[in-house]
């Protein structure tokens, strides 16, 4: 065939390919029946009630609401060095490299061939009756090929790869949200363990003073041995509670070291110096359902996985249609010693159409891709519903623990008033000193219960911030 005929054939194939070019498979949008589209999912929260809750948007760096420079520094260190975040960053780079690889499929493929061999070719292969001699054969060639994306298979593949990259990026944000919340939680537990130990130590001091009084009363004949034994038991019971707070502090300390990517020995002592519980100076800003679904990275991850699954339907559907590739080669083929002579020059241009018939396997792959997309939609709906459930649950717990705290504050205040009254009565000689110590013990118990609930309330706040999905953004607060 003459070169002009070859070029005309190539031009005709390219023209037909471009004329028929289309993109098969669904054009992705979030389905109208998705849970995220429901009006209730975009409305305010049912449990967002009371003065302690604000409908203002959640700040990007919510931990700064505690106004603790030490906590801010710990969170920054965790984001920079946490091992889970380092792994997530590596996964993201891998996904980005995969996108680059898929994008390269759109480019022409160019390759070179350099070959030398000693061989005897078959005479029959060249329609020659005689036996051919043994010679050194050589080949130098440049080859190029290009796939016409007639049905959008490459385009859908790029869409799937890009959506997968975005899903991996969202997974990295999920890890960051978790690490930030766990870091704040560990620091909260350190602070509250120290504070509760101080309260327990004060109660122990009161018990020891009560024991000393009981022993003095027994010595002067105004007490009983049973009262001394009772006081001794109370002292030992109170003393036994102190190691628990040390253990809780140490456990939180070691967990904090892990979150910061450090060995326990490398964590500064200042990390456990906190003895004042963290306090929010404002209502917790929670926003609404629309902001929640946009902010939570696990929702974004599931939605991007759905987009990737939808694009893969197009990839599978394109396999039902013919595939056309254009190719060209230019080189030298012949006896190695003769390479470069006109007789060894070769070139070729052409097109290749391939079509798998029957296509039962391709149709099955389309059905598989469609089923995978349906599963991804179900997963997306599940993540949305879980996000709403976790947020409402966290709000409910926080609200009810606030109510409990109000009652405990009142009980503590009443115990404090009684202790003050008994102290004045003792000073006036109207009541024995033992009654004042009993009132002091009641006050100490009320303070211990309140301190325990304060810790629970602080952990409720952290769980609420975690449910709201904040902490992955890199912007300024």
Predicted regions: what is each one?
Residues 154, 163, 170-288, 397, ...:
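Periplasmic alpha-helical coiled-coil/stalk elements that build and connect Gram-negative outer-membrane
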């Amino acid at each position: 065939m003459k070169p002009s005929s070859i070029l005309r054939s190539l031009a005709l194939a390219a023209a037909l390919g471009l004329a028929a070019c289309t993109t098969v498979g669904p054009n992705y949008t979030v389905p109208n029946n998705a849970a995220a589209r429901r009006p209730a999912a975009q409305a305010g929260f049912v449990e967002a009630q009371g003065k302690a809750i604000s409908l203002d948007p959640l700040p990007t760096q919510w931990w700064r609401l505690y106004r603790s420079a030490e906590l801010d520094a710990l969170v920054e260190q965790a984001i920079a060095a946490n091992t889970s975040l380092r792994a997530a960053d590596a996964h993201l780079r891998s996904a980005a490299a995969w996108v680059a690889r898929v994008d390269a499929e759109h480019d022409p493929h160019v390759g070179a061939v350099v070959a030398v061999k000693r061989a005897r070719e078959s005479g029959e292969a060249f329609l020659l009756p005689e036996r051919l001699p043994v010679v050194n054969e050589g080949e130098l060639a440049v080859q190029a090929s290009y796939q016409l994306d007639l049905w959008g298979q490459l385009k859908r593949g790029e869409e799937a790869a890009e959506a997968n990259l975005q899903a991996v990026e969202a997974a990295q944000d999920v890890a960051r949200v978790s690490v930030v919340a766990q870091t704040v939680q560990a620091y909260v537990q350190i602070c509250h363990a120290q504070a509760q130990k101080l309260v327990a130590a004060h109660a122990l001091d009161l018990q020891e003073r009560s024991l000393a009084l009981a022993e003095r009363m027994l010595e002067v004949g105004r007490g009983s041995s049973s009262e001394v034994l009772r006081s001794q038991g109370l002292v030992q019971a109170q003393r036994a509670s102190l190691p628990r707070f040390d253990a809780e502090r140490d456990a939180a300390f070691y967990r904090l070291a892990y979150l910061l990517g450090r060995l326990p020995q490398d964590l500064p002592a200042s990390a456990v110096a906190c003895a004042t519980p963290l306090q929010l100076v404002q209502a917790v800003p929670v926003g609404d359902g629309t902001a929640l679904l946009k902010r939570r990275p696990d929702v974004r991850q599931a939605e991007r996985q759905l987009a990737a699954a939808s694009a893969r339907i197009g990839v599978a559907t394109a396999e039902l249609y013919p595939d056309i590739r254009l190719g060209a080669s230019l080189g030298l083929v012949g006896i190695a010693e003769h390479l470069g002579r006109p007789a060894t020059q070769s070139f070729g241009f052409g097109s290749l159409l391939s079509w798998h018939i029957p296509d039962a396997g391709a149709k099955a792959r389309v059905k598989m891709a469609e089923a995978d997309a349906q599963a991804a939609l179900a997963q997306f709906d599940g993540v949305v519903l879980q996000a709403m459930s976790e947020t409402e649950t966290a709000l409910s717990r926080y609200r009810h623990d606030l109510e409990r705290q109000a009652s405990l504050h009142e009980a503590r205040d009443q115990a404090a008033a009684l202790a003050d009254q008994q102290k004045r009565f003792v000073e006036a000689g109207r009541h024995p000193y033992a009654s004042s110590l009993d009132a002091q013990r009641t006050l100490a118990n009320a303070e211990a219960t309140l301190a325990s609930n304060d810790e629970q309330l602080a952990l409720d706040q952290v769980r609420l911030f975690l449910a709201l999905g904040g902490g992955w953004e890199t912007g300024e607060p």
